[in-house]
UniProtKB/Swiss-Prot annotation:
Molecular-function annotations in GO: small ribosomal subunit rRNA binding; structural constituent of ribosome
Keywords: Ribonucleoprotein, Ribosomal protein, RNA-binding, rRNA-binding
Protein family (similarity comment): Belongs to the bacterial ribosomal protein bS6 family.
A Pfam family that the UniProt record links to this protein: Ribosomal_S6
Name recorded for this polypeptide: Small ribosomal subunit protein bS6
Function description: Binds together with bS18 to 16S ribosomal RNA.
Protein species of origin: Granulibacter bethesdensis (strain ATCC BAA-1260 / CGDNIH1)
One of the GO biological process terms: translation
A GO cellular component annotation in the UniProt record: cytosolic small ribosomal subunit
Start and end residues of each stretch annotated as Disordered: 107-154
Gene3D superfamilies cross-referenced by the UniProt entry: 3.30.70.60
NCBIfam families xref list: S6 (TIGR00166)
Domain of life: Bacteria
Biased composition (Basic and acidic residues): 125-154
């Protein structure tokens, strides 16, 4: 049987368990026709590139499928009918890797390096911290006290 990879995006207001139940439904459809699920990854709640059906975020799920083309057609029909699924895409692949996908490996790399690191200084910042009072520094450079302003002359 040919191999397929399917990515589906579910609405952001559903829970992870509901997304897993959609994947379980797909798995039951495929296994009923003699196919198998080779890979299953939950990518988490991610920001969409643009709004889809008034949603800015969605739960992503990757499925590696081993099924007949007629079964894939039925799975896609069921996904179209499911209101929780915003979008899906199924493509035919030569092989399904057992290693985690690039999306999952990138998430772990971000955690290891502290995500983004410290914020660099802005274009117009002098490097001083906010709330820095430079009056003490000015007085030290001027070499005088407040009494040397010439206001005491009467």
């Amino acid at each position: 049987m040919p191999l397929y990879e399917s990515v589906l995006i579910a609405r952001n207001d559903v829970t992870q368990q509901q997304v897993e139940s959609v994947a379980d439904h797909v798995a039951s459809l495929i296994e009923a026709e003699g196919g198998a699920i080779k890979k299953r990854e939950y990518w988490g709640l991610r920001t969409l590139a643009y709004r889809i059906k008034k949603n800015r975020k969605g739960h992503y799920m990757l499925l590696g499928l081993d099924a007949k083309p007629a079964t894939i057609t039925e799975v896609e029909r069921q996904l179209r009918l499911n209101e929780d699924v915003l979008r899906f895409m199924t493509i035919r692949v030569e092989e399904i890797d057992d290693v985690p996908s690039v999306i999952l490996s990138r998430k772990s790399d971000d955690r290891e390096r502290g995500f983004r690191g410290p914020k660099p200084p802005g274009r117009f910042e002098s490097g001083r911290k906010r709330g820095y009072d430079d009056r003490e520094e000015f007085r030290a450079r001027a070499g005088g006290d407040d009494d040397d302003r010439g206001l005491d002359q009467e």
